[in-house]
Structure formats: structure tokens, C-alpha cells
């Protein structure tokens, strides 16, 4: 696998970009997660960043990437509505793993947004999408720009939802390379990695949460529910960061 030209690929239509990366992705599927990270650092342009929501299994990708690339900027988009347990988990992992945490937030405070728009998350799919654009997408775009990112690592997995089932290891999103080192991991592999490295699930895992985001759009799992139904009232799975 040879080095890839981000500028040249960005000039191609989306379908052509996918085709251009197909051979590389076929080879990346054969590598383990650590090998994928190492390949990306050797063959894709910097600067490099890692995003995390500090969700249920966040410790895995944070540990895996950070041990290979210490001090990599870790981007968190903070909505102001995370669970108290999440904020404590962020502090715990930042200290334990010595993370180079970069927190980005909307330009409008949560209170100001509610005054202007009401509770957007109660306004159907359109309201949720506007909320996500303000609190997730715009801050992430700003983070990528300010950090001069050209390669973005994330911890998505195909097993998590139907919308992620066909994602490749390597793609281009928001004009940068996006690498998903643990895309093909199952829950058992996640558990084994956490055990091997003395890491923990998010504290709400023990209370029945399979996925954790904002307090107002996250539900505990109940028998018969798919994992994606625990977020955004089952109306959508993605918060916007990993779409497009």
C-alpha cells in the first residue's frame, strides 16, 4: 500500500473516491487494529487527531491509538448535556491515559440555545438534526480546522448499528482521511481488550446503558430493543459527526 494524496482524492466525486480507496481498504481489512493505526501514521498526512464521545467502550480506542501515538489531540464535542458520570469518566480517562484532550463546544451556550429555539431534541427529526448541527457538527468542523487535521481516527464499529454495518476502515469525510481501526471488532473483542489493559466500561454500562450520549436523548436498553433505539428516541442513530 502506497501513500495517498488527500488533495487529489478530494477533487474526485464521492463514488470515485470510494473506488480509489477500495484496494487500500481490502489490504487494511487484513491488518489488526494496531497495524491499521501504524499504517495510517506512516502513509497518511498529519496532523493526526482522535475523536471520542467518551461513551460506553471509549477507553478502547483512546488507549489503542494513544499508546501508538502519544499526545495525539483527542477531540471531545461537549454539548453541555452529558451525564455527570460521563464528565467524571472523561476526567478519569484523561488522567489515567495522559490524554491530550481538546474540548470544543457550540458558540451558543445550552441555556441560550433553549431560549432561542426551545428544546430542539423535542422537535422531531428536524429539531434533533439542528441540535446536532449546532452542538456536534459545527464544533467538530472547527476542531478539525483549528488543529490542521488531515487524518482523523475514530472508534466506530460495524456491530453498533445498521448505519455503520458497511463502513470501511478508511474513508474521506469533511475533507480529511478518516480511519476506523476497530471497525470490525465485536463486543467480545472489546471486553477482552478492556480486561487485558485494566480498562473500564463507562460507569453507566452497569446500569443498563448500551450507548451513552446526552441525558435527554439517551435511554436504558430494555429487552427487545435494538442498540440504536436507545438514542434519539429511535428516530436516528448518528449524531451527525459520522455522517456525510
From Swiss-Prot:
GO terms for cellular component: cytoplasm. The keyword Lipid metabolism does not apply. It comes from the Bacteria. The keyword Cytoplasm applies. It catalyses: [thioredoxin]-disulfide + sulfite + adenosine 3',5'-bisphosphate + 2 H(+) = [thioredoxin]-dithiol + 3'-phosphoadenylyl sulfate. The active site is at 239 (nucleophile). Coiled coil: none annotated. Its EC number is 1.8.4.8. GO terms for molecular function: phosphoadenylyl-sulfate reductase (thioredoxin) activity. Keywords: Cytoplasm, Oxidoreductase. InterPro entries: PAPS/APS_Rdtase, PAPS_reduct_dom, PAPS_reductase_CysH, Rossmann-like_a/b/a_fold. GO terms for biological process: hydrogen sulfide biosynthetic process; sulfate assimilation, phosphoadenylyl sulfate reduction by phosphoadenylyl-sulfate reductase (thioredoxin). It is found in: Cytoplasm. Pathway: Sulfur metabolism; hydrogen sulfide biosynthesis; sulfite from sulfate: step 3/3. Belongs to the PAPS reductase family. CysH subfamily. This is Phosphoadenosine 5'-phosphosulfate reductase. The lineage of its organism: Bacteria, Pseudomonadati, Pseudomonadota, Gammaproteobacteria, Enterobacterales. The gene is cysH.
